[in-house]
């Protein structure tokens, strides 16, 4: 209770001193208008007395818990502060009612209390300052013991605040400097500080009290006013002195901490140094080797997942190798694969370091050592192709004595000649080894249910599979010798300089290029061969295969290839075969297995092969009557990206190998990525309809023979193009085109998310002059890789070699101005080099390559037909830069109006523009929108007398499809292109705003959008129709027309 007694004594002393303070404050307040009056001060004194009595009562009741906060130096410090805290609500009432808010002396009770109840704290600070001054006068202690009325040691508070809080330190230093300046200024007796927060006001109150000054607030309660008093003093120590001590101690501590941390780090580093040194020295020695091992392991795994590296191995060890297993995904070979992936990593002693993880190379033949040639790795491929090993490709086995087609830098998996195995079924041979024939037959039955079975009476089939590895980077000019007698079935590998590039996830039926030929019933020794060329990485040459008829000797035993072609090229070395990365899948079935076809088809008089170079002729040794030679003395047909298939005497309708069609139809299926130009002339003097495609699926006759070489035996080739956006892993759709007498087949198209209306269409077509039909599906793989741009930058105008049609054909192609003119143009049209791309081509031959066969459903227009430029004058030289032909292919659908152009009719006149036909050659980036091909449709069948403004209102649906409407005057449009809406231009001349005076062209963002709009609008009750323009519209022309 000693604290309570001392508190009572102190309070009595304070009462006595209060009276003196009130008198002094009244005298000083004469100079200050805002200071409270004497009565207010007396009232406040009485209130202070009441407050102190209340504090006495509360302290006597014992707040020992809060009294523990008291300062050890001063006896009163915390007890009074706590008592005032509890008595604050009691005091607030009288103070507020009497409006005494003027005098406040710093209250060191609590920082939080001052912030929350600033008015009360300021008033308390005023009282405490009054109590403090008498204390100073009474006890003349040093400033070290200077306290306020609540017993808070101001010195200790200020020192602690200066040390612990940098912000408060700055504020205190500032206040100290201002107060010192005020004390030294004898002219002013008071100083008013600007408004500040309650916490800063509390600091100011305490600093003013520490300097022995009177401190009040103005009427707003925000600004503090200090007055000089008789007890005003300058403390013995400046604030900065306390800070220096603090700084020295703090800096020393921090320095020690940093030094400790550094020492700890050094200890850790010393502990880690041995490990790091060992690791570093190890990595220097083994990093390269380790990298190669991991790299090869990853690539080998990816190769297995892709299943594209279908290298042919004649050794039985192929079935025990896991790396070979991963290369046989599409082959269905799953037997005998017992070796684990660790076996790939165990072989590190090979000199071919990049192939170390693989203990066995799939390019090795029986007993042959691994090829020491470096592989073509994924880094040099077009689209993520795994390692493609180059090595000796064709090896001989115990079953035959085939000559070894080996050339350095070229690995072409050629079929090892196998003995015939008696089998009534057409077998899809996975490996051409006699020991594997039986399981190959089973796998064939499982994988290709659509292949028509060979009749029982036929001789045993000989199964061959050719898997082509990567061609060499530099072609070898060595001639290739091949002995045809050792192989009953001739497999002619043809290597174009551009490689095929297939997506990673094509469906199994079309996952690889397969060329299978099934002999007809009349064939003496029918054979079934399946070609599965692996995906070829970017490389000058790609090996393709042209298969001759089975049971007959090779047409030419000695093939001397040109220096441009790889020596493995047995047939034709395509000189400049310009083709973007793509893969062609060809499945060819003779008509003998087609039950509905009783007709005999003539063989092709004109070979379908690669044309090596202009004027080049390949020798042929012998020809069997039932087999047309793969190469003839004639100029080789220009073949831009498709495999030419020679047809025996008995060749029927060609169609897709779909299970739905079973053994009824035989087809030629071609898969490839977009952007190449394709020419497949079938028959001598046949017309080439080159149908390169970029985005859209389409089925159009690719070639029709109408001239004297094959008056009735020409086999038209139809393309079916499907862009990668429409595949999405689905099997490609193939159009089935039949001879005129055959019934129609319902062919459900594979689902295409981009073109839902084309889910099911009836594909029926009539061969132009002969019943034979070749259906080629050009299926774009939907892989993650972007379509590679071919080196060709131009397409010459399509020379379609008099695309006139025979009268007996139900649907006719558009004919040019005249067949002689077209042929003349073909022969004289030069190939425009890439550097000449901006220059217009002088070719004026037929540019519209799309046929108008009414029963032929066209999936989508082919955007870019390519044309010949060199060669024999009719066919473009392979490898020459192709020019884009700005022709628009009509998206003919079943039930859509056909466009029949009779012989002599100039439906597509390029002559009206002469040789000034504007051609915008596509640059290397074929995705540019300069070439307007399948994206342009003409608006026809508008209501008569409709004006342009009214017509624009009808085109809202086109605008919703993203189409831009271009109004071309008749001078710019094609006569008659408006479908009759501009036929009355003469009489409508007085109505310049009539829509009939214009050729209305809708330019869609993509051929697919044009296709969908044509399907939607032409089949609806819309007041206009859309059709593919008969004229080649250059985008520049359309832009100029739109700007007028």
Swiss-Prot record:
Keywords: Nucleus, Phosphoprotein. Its main location: nucleus. Residues 509-521, 554-572, 818-848 have a biased composition (Polar residues). The keyword Cell membrane does not apply. PROSITE patterns: R3H, SUZ. Residues 58-71 have a biased composition (Basic residues). Pfam families: R3H (PF01424), SUZ (PF12752). Residues 233-303 form the SUZ domain. Residues 169-232 form the R3H domain. Residues 338-349, 433-449, 757-770 have a biased composition (Low complexity). Residues 36-56, 109-143, 261-270, 277-288 have a biased composition (Basic and acidic residues). The modification Phosphoserine is found at residues 37, 143, 362, 365, 381, 921, 923. Residues 23-71, 106-147, 261-288, 320-408, 433-485, 502-533, 551-600, 729-770, 807-848 are annotated as: Disordered. It is found in: Nucleus. The modification Phosphothreonine is found at residues 924, 928. One of its GO terms (cellular component) is nucleus. One of its GO terms (molecular function) is nucleic acid binding. This is R3H domain-containing protein 2.
């Amino acid at each position: 209770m000693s604290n309570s007694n001392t508190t009572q004594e102190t309070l009595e002393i304070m009462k006595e001193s209060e009276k003196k303070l009130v008198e002094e404050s009244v005298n000083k307040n004469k100079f200050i208008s805002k200071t409270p009056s004497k009565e207010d001060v007396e009232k406040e004194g009485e209130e202070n007395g009441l407050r102190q009595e209340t504090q006495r009562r509360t302290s006597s009741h014992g707040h020992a818990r809060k009294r523990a906060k008291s300062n050890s130096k001063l006896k009163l410090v915390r007890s009074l502060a706590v008592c005032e805290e509890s008595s604050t609500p009691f005091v607030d009432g009288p103070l507020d009612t009497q409006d005494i808010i003027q005098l406040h002396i710093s209250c060191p009770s609590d920082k939080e209390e001052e912030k929350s109840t600033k008015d009360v704290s300021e008033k308390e600070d005023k009282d405490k300052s009054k109590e403090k001054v008498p204390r100073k006068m009474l006890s003349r202690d040093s400033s070290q013991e200077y306290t306020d009325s609540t017993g808070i040691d101001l010195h200790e508070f200020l020192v602690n605040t200066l040390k612990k809080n940098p912000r408060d330190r700055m504020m205190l230093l500032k206040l100290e400097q201002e107060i010192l300046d005020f004390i030294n200024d004898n002219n002013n007796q008071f100083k008013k500080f600007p408004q500040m927060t309650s916490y800063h006001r509390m600091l100011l109150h305490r600093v003013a009290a520490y300097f022995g000054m009177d401190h009040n607030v103005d009427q707003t309660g925000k600004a503090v006013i200090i007055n000089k008093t008789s007890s005003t003093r300058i403390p013995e120590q400046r604030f900065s002195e306390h800070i220096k001590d603090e700084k020295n101690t703090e800096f020393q501590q921090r320095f020690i901490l940093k030094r400790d941390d550094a020492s700890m780090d050094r200890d850790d580093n010393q502990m880690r140094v041995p490990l790091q040194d060992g690791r570093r020295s190890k990595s220097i020695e083994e990093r390269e080797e380790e990298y190669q091992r991991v790299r090869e392991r990853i690539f080998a795994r990816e190769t297995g997942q892709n299943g594209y590296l279908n290298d042919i191995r004649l050794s039985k060890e192929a079935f025990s190798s896991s790396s070979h297993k991963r290369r046989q995904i599409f082959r269905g070979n799953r037997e005998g694969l017992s070796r684990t992936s660790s076996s790939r990593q165990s072989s590190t002693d090979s000199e071919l370091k990049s192939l170390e993880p693989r203990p066995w190379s799939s390019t090795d033949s029986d007993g042959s050592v691994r090829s020491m040639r470096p592989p073509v790795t994924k880094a040099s491929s077009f689209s993520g192709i795994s390692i493609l090993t180059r090595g000796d490709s064709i090896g001989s086995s115990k079953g035959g004595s085939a000559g070894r087609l080996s050339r350095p830098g070229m690995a072409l998996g050629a079929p090892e000649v196998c003995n015939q195995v008696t089998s009534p079924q057409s077998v899809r041979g996975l490996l051409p080894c006699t020991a594997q024939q039986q399981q190959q037959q089973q796998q064939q039955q499982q994988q290709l249910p659509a292949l028509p079975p060979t009749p029982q009476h036929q001789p045993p089939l000989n199964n061959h599979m050719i898997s082509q590895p990567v061609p060499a980077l530099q072609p070898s000019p060595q001639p290739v010798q091949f002995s045809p007698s050792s192989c009953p079935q001739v497999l002619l590998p043809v290597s174009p300089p551009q490689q095929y590039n297939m997506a990673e996830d094509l469906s199994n039926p079309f996952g690889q290029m397969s060329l299978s030929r099934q002999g007809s019933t009349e064939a003496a020794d029918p054979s079934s061969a399946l070609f599965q060329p692996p995906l070829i990485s970017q490389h000058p040459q790609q090996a393709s295969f042209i298969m001759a008829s089975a049971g007959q000797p090779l047409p030419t035993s000695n093939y001397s290839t040109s220096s441009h072609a790889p020596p493995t090229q047995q047939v034709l070395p395509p000189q400049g075969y310009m083709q973007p990365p793509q893969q062609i899948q060809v499945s060819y079935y003779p008509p003998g297995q087609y039950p509905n076809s009783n007709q005999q088809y003539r063989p092709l008089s004109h070979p379908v092969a690669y044309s090596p170079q202009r004027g080049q002729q390949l020798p042929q040794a012998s020809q069997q009557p039932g087999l047309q030679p793969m190469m003839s003395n004639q100029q080789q047909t220009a073949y831009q990206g498709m495999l030419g298939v020679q047809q025996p005497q008995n060749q029927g309708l060609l169609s897709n190998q779909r299970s739905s069609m079973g053994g009824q139809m035989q087809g030629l299926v071609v898969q490839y990525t977009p952007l190449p130009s394709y020419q497949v002339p079938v028959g001598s003097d046949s017309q080439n309809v080159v149908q390169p495609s970029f985005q859209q699926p389409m089925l159009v006759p690719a070639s029709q023979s109408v001239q004297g070489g094959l008056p009735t035996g020409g086999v038209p080739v139809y393309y079916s193009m499907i862009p990668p956006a429409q595949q999405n892993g689905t099997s490609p759709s193939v159009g089935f085109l039949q001879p005129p007498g055959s019934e129609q087949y319902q062919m459900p198209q594979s689902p295409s998310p981009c073109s839902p209306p084309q889910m099911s269409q009836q594909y029926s077509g009539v061969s132009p002059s002969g019943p034979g039909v070749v259906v080629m599906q050009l299926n774009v793989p939907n892989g993650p890789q972007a379509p590679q741009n071919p080196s060709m930058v131009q397409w010459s105008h399509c020379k379609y070699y008099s695309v006139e049609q025979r009268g007996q054909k139900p649907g006719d192609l558009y004919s040019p101005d005249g067949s002689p003119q077209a042929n003349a143009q073909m022969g004289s049209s030069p190939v425009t080099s890439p550097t000449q791309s901006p220059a217009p081509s002088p070719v004026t031959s037929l540019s519209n390559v799309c046929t108008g066969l009414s029963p032929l459903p066209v999936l989508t227009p082919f955007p870019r037909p390519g044309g010949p430029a060199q060669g024999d004058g009719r066919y473009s030289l392979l490898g020459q830069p192709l020019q884009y032909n700005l022709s628009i292919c009509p998206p003919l659908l079943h039930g859509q109006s056909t466009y029949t152009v009779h012989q002599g009719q100039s439906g597509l006149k390029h002559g009206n523009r002469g040789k000034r036909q504007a051609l915008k050659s596509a640059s290397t980036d074929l995705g540019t929108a300069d070439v307007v091909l399948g994206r342009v449709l003409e608006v026809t069948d508008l209501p008569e007398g409709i004006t342009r403004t009214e017509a624009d209102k009808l085109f809202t649906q086109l605008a919703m499809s993203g189409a831009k409407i271009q109004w071309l005057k008749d001078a710019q449009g094609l006569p008659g292109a408006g479908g009759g809406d501009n036929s009355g231009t003469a009489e409508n001349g007085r109505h310049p705003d009539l829509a009939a005076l214009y050729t209305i062209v809708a330019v869609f963002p993509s051929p697919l959008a044009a296709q969908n709009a044509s399907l939607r609008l032409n089949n609806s009750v819309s007041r206009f129709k859309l059709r593919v323009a008969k004229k080649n519209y250059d985008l520049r022309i359309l832009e100029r027309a739109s700007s007028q």
